[in-house]
Amino acid sequence: MELLNGTGLWPMAIFTVIFILLVDLMHRHQRWTSRYPPGPVPWPVLGNLLQVDPSNMPYSMYKLQHRYGDVFSLQMGWKPMVIVNRLKAVQEVLVTHGEDTADRPPVPIFKCLGVKPRSQGVVFASYGPEWREQRRFSVSTLRTFGMGKKSLEEWVTKEAGHLCDAFTAQNGRSINPKAMLNKALCNVIASLIFARRFEYEDPYLIRMLTLVEESLIEVSGFIPEVLNTFPALLRIPGLADKVFQGQKTFMAFLDNLLAENRTTWDPAQPPRNLTDAFLAEVEKAKGNPESSFNDENLRMVVVDLFTAGMVTTATTLTWALLLMILYPDVQRRVQQEIDEVIGQVRCPEMTDQAHMPYTNAVIHEVQRFGDIAPLNLPRITSCDIEVQDFVIPKGTTLIINLSSVLKDETVWEKPLRFHPEHFLDAQGNFVKHEAFMPFSAGRRACLGEPLARMELFLFFTCLLQHFSFSVPAGQPRPSTLGNFAISVAPLPYQLCAAVREQGH
């Protein structure tokens, strides 16, 4: 009765507070060692959750790095986290300790999206037999269907032609190029996965791109961070369905595409696309409970290819066109090199790249300056490791700050400016820096890097071969600030695409 009247609540409240504080102290035991990386003092229970800005994590990391050094720690709720900055420390983690830092930490929100131990795809999969099996399959199959070969190059070149037609149809009007670039890159991925192409005005394609964008927004930001930090909240009935509605709709959309592909798949015929090849492996794996080839994992592999393979390259090209309208002298110099090496009639080819050092330097500088993936996907240590004289215990989440490498003032002459000469020597030859790692490094480096490099060169040169891009008359100069949502995209901007006349 005293408890109900409130007189007995104080002892219970005091006990609860003491219990929570003891649990909190237990989760901070790493900080009790003298060689643990320094960092801001965490709040009880919340840790440093309120001391970082999820909407602009790169800037939060920048400020903390300048205060605590190249290797510093955070406590997100009760999850210990170490942020690794600058080239030397990043190389230690990704290369020297590559085997010990290749695993991914658990992501509780993914369980709500149907991710299971044997259906994690490739990008977010735990480091182990299933990941090796799927990465080996993905690399092998992408090569089978043309990655690094003339066949895929011809497909990309053909799609670049369709993209040029779409720009021409605008008749020099002021447009935001983002949608058209997304459609072009989506078609390249769709060709690999489904062996099909969508017209740019196809409602099906427009719907798919809308769902991709919505799903990426849903899994980034403050709410997902809170749910991953305190996964018990995911048990609230209906919460996950409401928070991740767009993600689940996107999954259902892909399920329909995969079902359509399955109805026309003939196991007796050579695979037409990646989906056919995966379905063939599913058939082989029947009765093997250890295999990662199953229908659920097919969906996750496709999600990986669309998000990692399409969005990143389209975003980089969006940065490229923005920088061309902001730096017209650079644009004209690229066009001059295109005219000298390729001309204005023949389609660009990958063999041209070796003879176009300035264009190659500009593409690399776009990737460096755009810095679209500033924070590498999280990893977790599988044993104690030593980095820069600090000891990082087993089970610590690692965040690799690639932005600190791409914009390191000790490496780059003008780290915060767009400066293609970063990749040219005194004689004008192309030079690649070891600090250039937009695709990460080590065992979990981007498996689609060869495809992305091909797409960037062919789309970029084809566009500048046919058009001159400029800021629309009467409009202010666009900003080079980015919008962070897993990747960093330019703020919305407008441009005009004027068809180049022969000989100009």
Swiss-Prot record:
| Gene3D superfamilies linked | Cytochrome P450
UniProt keyword annotations, A-Z: Endoplasmic reticulum, Glycoprotein, Heme, Iron, Membrane, Metal-binding, Microsome, Monooxygenase, Oxidoreductase
Cofactor(s), by name: heme
GO cellular component annotations of the record: cytoplasm; endoplasmic reticulum membrane; intracellular membrane-bounded organelle
Keyword Disulfide bond found: no
Name a biological process GO annotation. Answer: xenobiotic metabolic process
Q: What class of enzyme is it?
A: oxidoreductase
Which residues have a glycan attached per UniProt? S382
Reaction(s) catalysed by this chain, per the record, are: an organic molecule + reduced [NADPH--hemoprotein reductase] + O2 = an alcohol + oxidized [NADPH--hemoprotein reductase] + H2O + H(+)
Residues annotated to bind heme: C446
Q: What is the membrane topology noted in the UniProt record heading this document?
A: Peripheral membrane protein
Q: Name one Pfam family in it.
A: p450
Q: What EC number(s) has UniProt assigned to this enzyme?
A: 1.14.14.1
Q: What is its main location?
A: endoplasmic reticulum
- MF (Gene Ontology): heme binding; iron ion binding; monooxygenase activity; oxidoreductase activity, acting on paired donors, with incorporation or reduction of molecular oxygen, reduced flavin or flavoprotein as one donor, and incorporation of one atom of oxygen
Subcellular location per the Swiss-Prot or TrEMBL entry: Endoplasmic reticulum membrane; Microsome membrane
State what induces this protein: P450 can be induced to high levels in liver and other tissues by various foreign compounds, including drugs, pesticides, and carcinogens.
User: Could you say which protein family the record assigns here?
Assistant: Belongs to the cytochrome P450 family.
User: In UniProt terms, what function does this protein have?
Assistant: Cytochromes P450 are a group of heme-thiolate monooxygenases. In liver microsomes, this enzyme is involved in an NADPH-dependent electron transport pathway. It oxidizes a variety of structurally unrelated compounds, including steroids, fatty acids, and xenobiotics.
This one is known as: Cytochrome P450 2D10
Q: Which gene holds the coding sequence for this protein?
A: Cyp2d10
